């Protein structure tokens, strides 16, 4: 009996210890997933979960702050220019040439994106169709006399048909987005281009507003003050939206959406 109790106690302690000690490979996988280049619009669909009946009625899944897919980048190794403090006023490792720049070039460096998106679209079309048909036949004559039926009707007819169609349509759409967001370099490509990704969350009263951005930039397009225009980003994915009560009031309910589709 004592041996059985000791065995159970040992098993329990071992299980608790297993829960406390985390597998290093699991930590590595979490870091890898955190540094994945995720689309700013689509998000990380691999980890989407059902948020309950409220989100089902809303018809959308709101993103959350602190998503591991958008976590900051933390380089494991120290940068090449890093050096321990020696107490000297001059350190060659911290020296910067007069003609050198401080543009982001490595993993984890930051750059500020100036949002200046303006798009306009206008389209119109006019169509006009018309068709006219006329057909007639003179009365039949036999021996110089009209051939009649019953003394009242002759064999003649006259037909006319007119068809007219006029249609016009027009569509106008414009979008504007201005502001700024600071993002991080998550990968350096072989040609020197930089993959960037970042998000900004603002808590305002009863809801949150967020901006997410990802894309590819060239170091040459970065300005001297470490900023770059959003129009210089290749494969840009920009998402600006919100969550909470104010966002819910801007969208129709699920019954309204159902009848809009059904009817």
UniProtKB/Swiss-Prot annotation:
Residue positions of covalent lipid attachment, annotated as S-diacylglycerol cysteine: 16
Localization in the cell: Cell outer membrane; Bacterial flagellum basal body
Pfam families for this protein: FlgH (PF02107)
Residues with lipid group (N-palmitoyl cysteine): 16
Gene Ontology biological-process entries: bacterial-type flagellum-dependent cell motility
Span of the signal peptide: 1-15
Keywords for this protein: Bacterial flagellum, Cell outer membrane, Lipoprotein, Membrane, Palmitate, Signal
One GO MF term attached to the UniProt entry: cytoskeletal motor activity
Signal is among the record's keywords: yes
Membrane topology: Lipid-anchor
Stretches the record annotates as Disordered: 123-143
GO CC annotation, single: bacterial-type flagellum basal body, distal rod, L ring
Family classification: Belongs to the FlgH family.
PANTHER family for this protein: FLAGELLAR L-RING PROTEIN (PTHR34933:SF1)
Oligomeric form and interacting partners: The basal body constitutes a major portion of the flagellar organelle and consists of four rings (L,P,S, and M) mounted on a central rod.
NCBIfam families, per database record: PRK00249.1-2
Protein function: Assembles around the rod to form the L-ring and probably protects the motor/basal body from shearing forces during rotation.
Name of the protein this chain belongs to: Flagellar L-ring protein
Organism in which the protein naturally occurs: Aliivibrio fischeri (strain ATCC 700601 / ES114) (Vibrio fischeri)
Lineage: Bacteria, Pseudomonadati, Pseudomonadota, Gammaproteobacteria, Vibrionales
Gene: flgH
